[in-house]
């Protein structure tokens, strides 16, 4: 476990740091990096004090060599020694402000989860298709320290969000993005990241919503529309998925053909179970088994 100092925090008084409290009995993963913070007094009951840091402070936790005045460099490293921007998912990304890139706190997306867990997503790279991307980290600031549990990267549409979620003893990051190249071909997807050996590993992808219009195989000359909805429930031992696919013949102005009607609704439940570095699915996605079959 690496321990790095954060000089920028040394002068911050504890009274200026908003905080909450959590019970110490929660099982928290072992951090790969720890940064000392100015101490705060614990209150009665042995409850850990969750700290709220500003964007510059969080950047100093994830990337110890970060200097707000100097900006971000293309070869900057994180607290584990890996390059921040050298990831296959970020290939082709461009810093439109050049390098070194001035740090803009608005580009650091911060989302909170249970027990003080947070996910940071630094959205500084742009791609030809309109996506944005950059490093992502699962972190927590508690009592007299800030901890990093995993660092990776994510690329997705500008309105994507990456949030921390707890399943049993696992703290994971969940990235949700909506991709709609066409109104008849639209999908909302979730990527589930496990923290392993200091890295955030994309361990499963699930369609939360999806639509597709394809030629009907039972009604020649007409088109079938498939609509998927997935309910996600986080369990102590994994993720429960309830998938529903509605199939209907869409309206088509041709003669007196019977269009614009529901055909059927298909429902199926499957489970994503944590197995080492992946989330193992108990079955194939319902979408792959239904689309094109009417």
Residue ranges and their predicted role:
Residues 9-11:
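C-terminal motif of bacterial Sec signal peptides marking the signal peptidase cleavage site
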Residues 14-87, 181-294:
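Acidic, small-residue rich beta-repeat scaffolds with periodic aromatic anchors
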Residues 90-167:
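Short N-terminal edge-element motif at the start of the domain
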Residues 113-117, 142-143, 165-172, 197-198, ...:
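Short, solvent-exposed coil/turn segments at beta-strand boundaries
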Residues 116-126, 170-179, 239-248:
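Short beta-strand elements that form the blades of beta-propeller/WD-repeat-like
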Residues 153-195, 205-208:
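Eukaryote-skewed repeat-based solenoidal scaffolds used as protein-protein interaction platforms
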């Amino acid at each position: 476990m690496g321990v790095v100092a954060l000089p920028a925090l040394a002068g911050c008084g504890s009274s200026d740091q908003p905080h909450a409290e959590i019970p110490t009995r929660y099982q928290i993963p072992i951090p790969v990096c720890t940064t000392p913070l100015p101490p705060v007094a614990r209150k009665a009951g042995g409850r850990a004090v969750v700290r709220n840091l500003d964007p510059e402070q969080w950047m100093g936790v994830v990337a110890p060599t970060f200097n707000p005045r100097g900006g971000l460099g293309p070869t900057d490293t994180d607290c584990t020694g890996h390059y921040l921007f050298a990831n296959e998912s970020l290939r082709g990304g461009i810093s439109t402000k050049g390098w070194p890139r001035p740090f803009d706190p608005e580009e650091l997306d911060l989302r909170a989860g249970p027990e003080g867990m947070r996910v940071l997503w630094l959205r500084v790279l742009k791609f030809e298709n309109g996506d944005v991307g950059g490093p992502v980290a699962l972190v927590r600031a508690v009592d007299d320290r800030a901890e990093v549990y995993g660092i990776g990267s994510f690329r997705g549409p500008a309105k994507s969000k990456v949030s921390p979620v707890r399943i049993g003893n696992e703290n994971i990051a969940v990235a949700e993005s909506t991709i709609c190249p066409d109104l008849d071909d639209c999908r909302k997807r979730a990527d589930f990241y496990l923290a392993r050996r200091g890295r955030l590993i994309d361990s499963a992808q699930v369609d939360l919503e999806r639509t597709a219009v394809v030629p009907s195989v039972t009604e020649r000359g007409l088109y079938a529309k498939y609509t998927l909805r997935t309910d996600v429930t986080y369990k102590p031992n994994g993720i429960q998925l309830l998938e529903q696919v509605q199939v209907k013949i869409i309206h088509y102005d041709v003669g007196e053909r019977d269009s614009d009607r529901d055909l059927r609704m298909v429902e199926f439940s499957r489970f994503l179970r944590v197995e080492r570095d992946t989330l193992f699915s108990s079955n194939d996605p319902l979408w792959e088994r239904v689309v094109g079959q009417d």
